[in-house]
Amino acid sequence: MIEAWRRIFPGADAVGRDLLARYSEPHRRYHTPAHLARMLEVIDAHAELAADPDAVRLAAWFHDAVYDTFAPDNEERSASLASTTLAALGFSPERTAEVARLVRLTAGHNVEPGDRNGALLADADLAILASEAADYAGYAAAVRAEYAAVPDDVFRPGRAAILRKLADLPELFRIVPARAEWTARARANLESEIASLLGAR
């Protein structure tokens, strides 16, 4: 993974290793280096669709840098970390602001028309939703494990509400060429998990 960081910013290994350490925190089960690697694979495969592919890659690295399951402001804190870190590394204010904006966007995945950077980042972050059923089940189980301290009668309706908000987005995927196929599979996965969550109460 550090090689992927070096391709974006050679000479700043300490920052890359700090980010990987954050993604490797013991309370994480889904928001791990594997999630970051999958996002980067999607971004790399469709880099030509973004206005600034490296800004999208940097946003992927920072978007879950702060992850506290009980905090409502993880994306904002991750964006602040990105701003501080990139400014210290000598990035321009404009590019630093763009990366921070993209990190904040992952809070709700609300992408404005014409925002190619935001569209690619959001598609990469949500790509897991379009995975095959077995992989999706693993993702759902990993998310549940991150919230192991939350009782079922609280977790289930809360998780179902989050999934319903995603399922009701006018566009789940916005820019990847396979978005129609991804959307169909993602909606099927989401509806299946929602039914399981609400039916098991």
Task: Identify the residue ranges that each predicted region occupies.
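Divalent metal-dependent phosphate-bond-processing catalytic cores, especially two-metal-ion Mg2+/Mn2+ enzymes
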Residues: M1-R7, S24-H31, E41-A50, F62, ...
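Active-site metal-coordination segments of metallo-dependent hydrolases
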Residues: E25-H35, Y67-A79, P93
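His-Asp-centered metal-binding catalytic motifs of divalent-metal-dependent phosphohydrolases/nucleases
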Residues: M39, D54-T69, S78, R101-A107
